[in-house]
From Swiss-Prot:
GO process annotations (BP): negative regulation of protein localization to cilium
PANTHER family, per database record: LEUCINE ZIPPER TRANSCRIPTION FACTOR LIKE, LEUCINE ZIPPER TRANSCRIPTION FACTOR-LIKE PROTEIN 1
GO cellular component: cytoplasm
Assembly, per entry: Self-associates. Interacts with BBS9; the interaction mediates the association of LZTL1 with the BBsome complex and regulates BBSome ciliary trafficking.
Keywords (A to Z) from UniProt: Coiled coil, Cytoplasm
Subcellular locations according to the entry: Cytoplasm
Functional summary from the UniProt entry: Regulates ciliary localization of the BBSome complex. Together with the BBSome complex, controls SMO ciliary trafficking and contributes to the sonic hedgehog (SHH) pathway regulation. May play a role in neurite outgrowth. May have tumor suppressor function.
Segments for region (Interaction with BSS9): 145-299
Domain of life: Eukaryota
Organism this protein belongs to: Pongo abelii
Family: Belongs to the LZTFL1 family.
Pfam families: Leu_zip
Name of the molecule in the record: Leucine zipper transcription factor-like protein 1
Length: 299
């Protein structure tokens, strides 16, 4: 039997939809056939017709067939929308975002593959004995219990992750400002020392001692300011390290939540999509750690 690359459960769902569509298509074709049959019985009673009479008959038949085909195409489009709505509603319960590729709907190779699949399914169903078995309806997703707790935990971790990102951004700004101010103070001190060296040859001997004392006092004051800034920088670096530890803790909790989710719905279609989301989260965390490394002061 031809395959569509789906698991057994989803393939059975596709078969059920194709049977439904085939049934609707058959009913509509019977309606079109009846239009022609009614025309034969009601209008084709004379042996000869004029050109005007033939045109009138064909125009009337065209209008009826056009209406029937248009109605079926519209109904088919609405039916497909309802089917997509069911799938999207189930995905949203697991906080998933599904995507569709409209261009694939006109892929001739894939369309032929679906046609072969339908032919194989019809052949297979004709060989199977007809059993009076009522197919169970799709059970709604469980909104309570372990699944609900896991979803709430994921939301909490995501919120905490956003808070940590905001906190890290604030610490980064503070650290950058502190480094800039420290650089400015060091440059000012160097300029003052350079200016002192340039002026030593031009000042009188009796004023040299006073100037050196003034420079020493200024240097002491600058050094004190630099020490204060250094302590402030150390505090910011400690906050940065704490934030990193918190980020690692959140990453570990996200990893644990991912494992719990994998155990919970490892047999469902949502498993692959959820795993992709968690992988993207870990990639975002890795990217954030790389960005943090750029702001760490060099030894």
């Amino acid at each position: 039997m031809a395959e569509l690359g789906l698991n057994e459960h989803h393939q059975n769902e596709v078969i059920n939809y194709m049977r439904f569509a085939r049934s609707k298509r058959g009913l509509r074709l019977k309606t079109v056939d009846s239009c022609f049959q009614d025309l034969k019985e009601s209008r084709l009673v004379e042996e000869t017709f004029t050109i005007d009479e033939v045109s009138e008959v064909l125009n009337g038949l065209q209008a009826v067939v056009h209406s029937e085909v248009e109605s079926e195409l519209i109904n088919t489009a609405y039916t497909n929308v309802l089917l997509l709505r069911q799938l999207f509603a189930q995905a949203e319960k697991w906080y998933l975002k599904l995507q569709t590729d409209i261009s694939e709907l006109e892929n001739r190779e894939l369309l032929e593959q679906v046609a072969e699949f339908e032919k194989a399914e019809i052949t297979s169903s004709n060989k199977k004995p007809i059993l009076d078995v009522t197919k169970p309806k799709l059970a709604p997703l469980n909104e309570g219990g372990t699944a609900e707790l896991l979803n709430k935990e994921i939301l909490r971790l995501q919120e905490e992750n956003e808070k940590l990102k905001s906190r890290l951004k604030t610490v980064e700004i503070q650290a950058t400002n502190a480094l800039d101010e420290k650089s400015k103070l060091e440059k000012a001190l160097q300029d003052l020392q350079l200016d002192q060296g340039n002026q030593k040859d031009f000042i009188k001997a009796q004023d040299l001692s006073n100037l050196e004392n003034t420079v020493a006092a200024l240097k002491s004051e600058f050094q004190k300011t630099l020490n204060d800034k250094t302590e402030n920088q150390k505090s910011l670096e400690e906050n940065l390290a704490t934030a990193k530890h918190d980020l690692l803790r959140v990453q570990e909790q996200l990893h644990m939540a991912e494992k719990e989710l994998e155990k919970k719905f490892q047999q469902t279609a949502a498993y692959r999509n959820m795993k992709e989301i968690l992988t993207k989260k870990n990639d975002q965390i890795k990217d954030l750690r790389k960005r943090l490394a750029q702001y760490e002061p060099e030894d």
